[in-house]
């Protein structure tokens, strides 16, 4: 992987971290960030025709009554398995790479979803965020959610240890 590509991913992560920390400071409770923000955080490709606003922080909750009003934050109900991470220096929780992939299923074509998944299994150790087993396990233990069938359909097109997602399509 070129140094330029790595710097781009690091820059995207830094920008997302700033936006999400800012949103978390305005929140009165824990903020679980996912969707397009998590994709940027992990350096995954963003679907070309994704309808999610790039100007908002997208957070997920388990039920509609847990949504809150926070300026610049859009809450989504996600019924999949909760798999989150948090770094000590961050003020927000973020969806794991595999959970983010599952969340993006309803906003991606099959090809785009496979590209997102493959990018998370990169040959480059600095970019590798998940293994094929991680995806299989997540779908196995996760309850039904919107996009679950598309996730199963994308699995055969996702190859581990590739240099770039387009190698898979």
Question: Which role fits each region the language model picked out?
Answer:
Residues 1-155, 164-168:
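Short gly/ser-rich loop at a beta-strand->alpha-helix junction or flexible surface loop bordering the NTP-binding
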């Amino acid at each position: 992987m070129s140094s330029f590509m790595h710097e781009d991913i690091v820059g995207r992560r830094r920008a997302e971290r700033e936006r999400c920390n800012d949103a978390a400071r305005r929140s009165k409770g824990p903020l679980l960030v996912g969707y397009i923000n998590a994709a940027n955080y992990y350096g995954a490709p963003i679907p070309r025709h994704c309808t999610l606003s790039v100007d908002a922080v997208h957070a997920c909750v388990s039920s509609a009554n847990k949504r809150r009003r926070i300026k610049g934050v859009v809450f989504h109900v996600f019924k999949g398995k909760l798999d989150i991470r948090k770094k000590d220096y961050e003020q927000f929780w973020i969806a794991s790479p595999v959970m983010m992939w599952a969340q993006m299923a309803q906003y991606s074509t099959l090809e785009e979803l496979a590209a997102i998944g493959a990018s998370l299994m990169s040959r480059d150790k600095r970019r590798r965020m998940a293994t094929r087993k991680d995806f299989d396990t997540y779908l196995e233990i996760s309850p039904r959610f919107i996009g679950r069938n598309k996730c199963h359909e994308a699995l055969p097109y996702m190859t581990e240890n590739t240099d770039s997602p387009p190698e898979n399509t």
